[in-house]
Curated annotation (Swiss-Prot):
The keyword Plastid does not apply. The chain crosses the membrane at residues 8-28, 41-61, 86-106, 130-150, 171-191, 193-213, 235-255, 275-295, 323-343, 355-375, 387-407, 408-428, 444-464, 467-487. GO terms for cellular component: plasma membrane. This is Uncharacterized membrane protein MJ1068. It is found in: Cell membrane. It is a multi-pass membrane protein.
Length: 507
């Protein structure tokens, strides 16, 4: 199988999983928005953000090092080193996750009183906050570390069909358990998502533990485990850079939720984390799908010295990602209230301005997701780390400055500018390392086509009263004009698109 076919196959699996998981994820959020009090929804996401910030301490970057070294040892046919890497990372990651979870359980009363309830919204109900912290610590945080370990093994072996399926199984399990608790047991509070996430982790450990043991371990079951200094040094030297970088990405991804919890309260967290961010993050699904494939594949291409092939592939990925994300971002920025009314309810209309602002950052988020996977794949996690900390430092400073005064709008503005600053540095390093100029005039043409395609929509919108029909008609008109513009200006080649589609169908 050629690298192009392998890439198309891998991306297709991940896109399919996002296509299946995204509607379910939205159903989960719609369910919570309509069946659980907004304050309890905010509580759950505040606790989830808290544990997400602690994820960096449950593996010290060794999970990502595993993805980096599995294809390397496979290419070198070093099955002994491969098995040793998996065993070492698995043991250490499990121990670290348990220690952190145990410490959170011990200090749960203090975390609940002085952080989660800083605005006094759960005064008199602190027992609920403490219980949610304990459930998420021992359930979601600890057990999910084992799920992540299995998922990273599958990704490292480039078994993209299994790796991508974790996305669907995860959210589907949460959805099913949430339905059971709400409609069968009549539970309507923060226990619903918390316990659902715990049970989801149990289900996934059973399923993917079986797949890993059945599909992968027989290949090197007879190999001895060797804990050599070189192996441990390689894993830690790569993993520590990734860990430091991952800490930066966590600051970028969750610091806004942390600051909103502390400075503005849990209703703002519900707006931002249950509506605004998830809505805009849909736009990055293509980039995440591509990135999951490019990480191990770029590692393999780089190890074999195929720099030109890698550069060509990255250029195409950037262009196609921009073409896909641009129209969706523009429409999302133009119809935020329509989207909220259709998918959620009027209680969450206060999230509309944040959606508009974050939509413009979706393009930079897309590029950054792809670029970081490339940098990590070619063995430059130190560069990723530097860029991430530039963005994280910006976010840290401006979240503290803007959120107390502007709330979720301040969080959204900070996030978008953080993405943009990182993209500037990232594209410069990629141009230098791969000796290729990625930024070109086609990118500008794509954005211009996206903007001008909106003009007819502005006139059509006011002619239709029904919001669903309005969104449908405007979407059809917009995409029709946009596609004509993309092919009319020869930004992409129709024959190449047909070639990609044919490869997807064959798979």
């Amino acid at each position: 199988m050629s690298y192009k076919e392998k890439a198309v196959k891998g991306v297709s699996w991940h896109l399919l999983s996002y296509f299946l998981a995204a509607p379910i994820a939205y159903l989960v959020r719609v369910l919570y928005a309509n069946e659980i009090p907004k304050l309890d929804v905010g509580l759950f996401y505040a606790v989830l953000d808290f544990f997400s910030m602690l994820v960096v301490f449950r593996a010290f970057g060794l999970d990502q090092a595993l993805i980096r070294y599995i294809p390397k040892y496979l290419a070198e046919n070093r099955l002994d080193m491969l098995k040793s890497s998996i065993v070492f990372v698995g043991i250490l990651q499990t121990i670290l996750a348990f220690i952190v979870a145990f410490l959170v359980v011990i200090f749960a009363p203090y975390i609940a009183e002085f952080y989660i309830n800083n605005q006094g919204q759960f005064t008199g109900r602190l027992d609920l906050v403490i219980n949610i912290l304990i459930i998420m610590a021992m359930g979601y945080y600890f057990l999910d570390s084992i799920v992540a370990f299995f998922s990273n093994i599958l990704t490292g072996f480039q078994l993209q069909n299994y790796a991508s399926s974790t996305r669907v199984v995860r959210i589907l399990s949460v959805f099913i358990f949430s339905l059971i608790f709400i409609y069968l047991f009549n539970v309507h509070n923060a226990y619903v998502p918390s316990v659902s996430y715990l049970l989801m982790a149990v289900v996934m450990i059973i399923i993917y533990g079986y797949i890993v043991v059945k599909k992968i371990f027989p290949k090197f079951a007879k190999e001895k485990v060797i804990f050599s200094r070189k192996l441990i040094r390689n894993l830690f030297s790569y993993g520590m850079y990734v860990m430091i970088g991952y800490a930066g990405s966590l600051i970028l991804g969750y610091l806004d939720g942390i600051c909103l919890t502390y400075f503005t309260g849990l209703n703002a967290v519900a707006d931002y984390r249950n509506v605004a961010m998830p809505t805009v993050n849909i736009l990055s699904y293509f980039a995440f799908s591509v990135g999951a494939v490019l990480f191990p594949m770029s590692s393999e291409l780089w190890e074999k010295g195929y720099k030109k092939a890698l550069s060509y592939g990255v250029e195409k990925v950037f262009l196609y990602s921009l073409i896909i994300v641009t129209p969706l971002a523009i429409l999302m920025a133009y119809f935020p209230t329509v989207i909220i009314n259709i998918l959620f309810n009027p209680k969450y209309l206060s999230a509309a301005p944040a959606i508009q602002i974050l939509s413009f950052g979706a393009m930079f988020l897309t590029f950054n997701s792809i670029g970081f996977n490339i940098l990590n794949g070619i063995g430059r996690p130190n560069i990723s780390t530097k860029i991430l900390y530039i963005g994280a430092s910006f976010n840290l400073i401006f979240n503290i400055l803007l959120i107390p005064k502007f709330g979720i709008i301040g969080a959204a503005i900070t996030t978008v500018f953080g993405y943009f600053i990182m993209w500037i540095f990232q594209i410069w390093f990629l141009n230098k390392l791969l000796e290729h100029q990625f930024l070109n005039k086609k990118w500008i043409l794509v954005i211009l086509v996206g903007i001008f395609s909106l003009i007819p929509v502005m006139f059509i919108k006011d002619l239709i009263d029904n919001v669903i029909l309005q969104l449908f008609v405007c979407g059809v008109v917009y995409f029709g004009i946009y596609i004509l513009g993309i092919f009319g200006l020869k930004i992409i080649n129709i024959y190449e698109v047909k070639d990609i589609i044919s490869k997807i169908i064959k798979r």
